[in-house]
Amino acid sequence: SFAAWPLFLVKLQPLWNLSNFSVGWVSGAYFIGYVFATPVLVGLTDRYDAKYIYIFSTLIAAVGAFGFAMTAQGFWSAAFCWGLVGAGLAGTYMPGLQILNARLDDDHRLRLLPYYTSAFGIGTGLSFFVMGWLYSYANWTSAFIYAGLSSLSAGLLVSAVIRPQPVKNESDSPRRHPLDFRPAFRNAAAMRYI
């Protein structure tokens, strides 16, 4: 779904009479959804198996894409739905990495994680290819439905292939709320990356 809005905005901008400013905000809604959902969804992987966060997030992305196809009629509805798709990405990329971290030993992790991280770029390229093809041969509604189906397919694949893994709790550290970011803000080394 990554490339659905960037490609189809050319058709939707005149259809919905959107200004360039509005088009930019709809585009940005994806990343706003991503930024706000990332700390929540990634933080939840400390308490819950990342597999379930991933599957839940593919559902969020699918709801956003299907919502776009069926309800988007202008700026607000498009921005809301596209923001949901961005939130879905937040719960698939890093939790997907956590799925591997929790299931691989150090040796396999070092060998396989570069392939996982490069898959994002490959997937983005494929998204532009598929959406470009749909741009030529289908309407925007069909493209967003296809994007939603793709998200559901990813969730079903992970559900079928990845075995559940209990989260290892560190017994010597106190259990904190997943949205309590104070420990990160107090960690100077971590703040350099934030």
Question: Where do the model's predicted regions map?
Answer:
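Cytoplasmic helix-loop-helix junction between adjacent transmembrane helices
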Residues: 82-118
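Extracytoplasmic
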Residues: 1-14, 18
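Juxtamembrane intracellular "pre-TM" segments in multi-pass secondary transporters
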Residues: 166-193
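Helix-loop-helix hairpin linking two adjacent transmembrane segments in secondary transporters
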Residues: 116-162
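Conserved MFS/SLC helix-loop-helix module at the cytosolic interface between two early adjacent transmembrane helices
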Residues: 36-72
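Residue-level signature of mid-helix packing/kink "hotspots" within the transmembrane helices
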Residues: 3, 31-39, 124-125
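Helix-loop junctions at membrane interfaces in 12-TM secondary transporters
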Residues: 70-80
